[in-house]
Amino acid sequence: MSDIALTVSVLALVAVVGLWIGNIKVRGVGFGIGGVLFGGIIVGHFVDQAGVTLSGDMLHFIQEFGLILFVYTIGIQVGPGFFASLRVSGLRLNLFAVLIVIMGGLVTAILHKIFAIPLPVVLGIFSGAVTNTPALGAGQQILRDLGTPVDLVDQMGMSYAMAYPFGICGILLTMWLMRLIFRVNVEAEAQKHESSLANGHSLIQTMNIRVENPNLNNMAIQDVPILNSDKIICSRLKRDDTLMVPSPGTIIQAGDLLHLVGQPTDLHNAQLVIGKEVDTSLSTRGTDLRVERVVVTNEKVLGKRIRDLHFKERYDVVISRLNRAGVELVASSDASLQFGDILNLVGRPASIDAVANVVGNAQQKLQQVQMLPVFIGIGLGVLLGSIPLFVPGFPVALKLGLAGGPLIMALILGRIGSIGKLYWFMPPSANLALRELGIVLFLAVVGLKSGGDFVDTLTQGEGLSWIGYGIFITEIPLITVGLLARIFAKMNYLTLCGMLAGSMTDPPALAFANNLHATSGAAALSYATVYPLVMFLRIITPQLLAVIFWGMG
């Protein structure tokens, strides 16, 4: 059997064994995709014992390409929400998550200096303790750039594997301790979160208002400031028994019923100006109007603003809402359409069909992947990661590397959405498939390279002390920030659990947090809020630590 065939066969065996290990769960918690690392260690041990030689160049390529696929698809997935998460609404959560990352780096630096832990080993312990695989890849990349011998770089994978198991268990232990210390009632916390959402600014709601302000009688909608804004959409108007789709030039009269869409505060302000909220239904049932959701798939409208498409003037159709990446938004006239946007249309059936044809509404396109943008994005990401950043006093130039470059580029492209006929939308199923393939390939190779010496290191070497160092790196930041967030910021327990899981970019921990309450989405929401920024910082941190330690050494 050729070297290539043998290498592929062994990798396939690693994936099978590792995924099987990952599916084993104790009390609903397992290693998940991280099981592939341990599958690689097991197979790597026996491959080494048997004296089998695999293709080193091929393993190196597969490891790097797998990492690129993984971080790129993560960036495309979270890109649309990344920059929004940095705004004020998620600022507090992100600050606490950043504090966890910084404290983890400080603990790592202190351990490195006190116990004289070799640089590759301490970086591997750091990556495993925070359960972040891209950090492992970024650390190995910068060590190679610094001229570290290959056998020492491979030690990073071994120390990562030592620290990884407690990294997963440690976050779950922290959640349990927070619940025990503060005697948390999970049901009460879920109800508090729901009530805070209802009073917040994040939910799009509707309100039916009767026009009672005499100053508005016989005025056009466009002349009423609160209605002629990007915060409120008037999608229906009922006069006597007639329901119509209003346009900016529609004249409103006293007694008209307006169906408004917007955020709660804006709707309340509109009600104070216009009149009184009523319970009267403005349903399209029994009328010649209907409400329908269509999806944007036509490349010709991508990037165009809603106002420039003139749907109301041409088709007598109003867009009442816009759903982007699962987030409901007010369909402001300045909003630009992106591939995969879901539009809520109000109008007559024939008119809605006409608008649907304009925007595409081809459901099958949502299941197709444009491969050209994928490779353009990966290529640009690799180029970005290769740009040297020279910092005075540092022995080598800093680089985003093969982990950071594709991630940053994917975040930018995911936020842009489309350029001309190229769109970076990727169906969730395709994104997940590429992401899982990438991380399986990466972890399989890391495990194989670590497996030969793993048992000896654990039983006769420094393995147990590495595990101990990892426990400090995992627990000190989590417990400290958890206490600060709960005591001083009065953070909701479920939100806190999601933030802690997100700060470690740990899907098994998120699964555990979600299972704390069957219906609350608090943990998932906070996890998604901090995940993009934390993922970026987790990739940059080992590179900074490596360069700083190298310069000090």
UniProtKB/Swiss-Prot annotation:
InterPro entries: AAE_transporter, RCK_C, RCK_C_sf, Transpt_YidE_put, YidE_YbjL. Its main location: membrane. The chain crosses the membrane at residues 4-24, 28-48, 65-85, 95-115, 158-178, 371-391, 393-413, 437-457, 464-484, 493-513, 533-553. One of its GO terms (cellular component) is plasma membrane. One of its GO terms (molecular function) is monoatomic cation transmembrane transporter activity. It holds the Pfam family Asp-Al_Ex. It is found in: Cell membrane. Keywords: Cell membrane, Membrane, Repeat, Transmembrane, Transmembrane helix, Transport. GO terms for biological process: potassium ion transport. It is a multi-pass membrane protein. Residues 192-276, 279-361 form the RCK C-terminal domain. It comes from the Bacteria. NCBIfam families: PRK03818.1, YidE_YbjL_dupl. Belongs to the AAE transporter (TC 2.A.81) family. YidE subfamily. HAMAP family: YidE. This is Putative transport protein YidE.
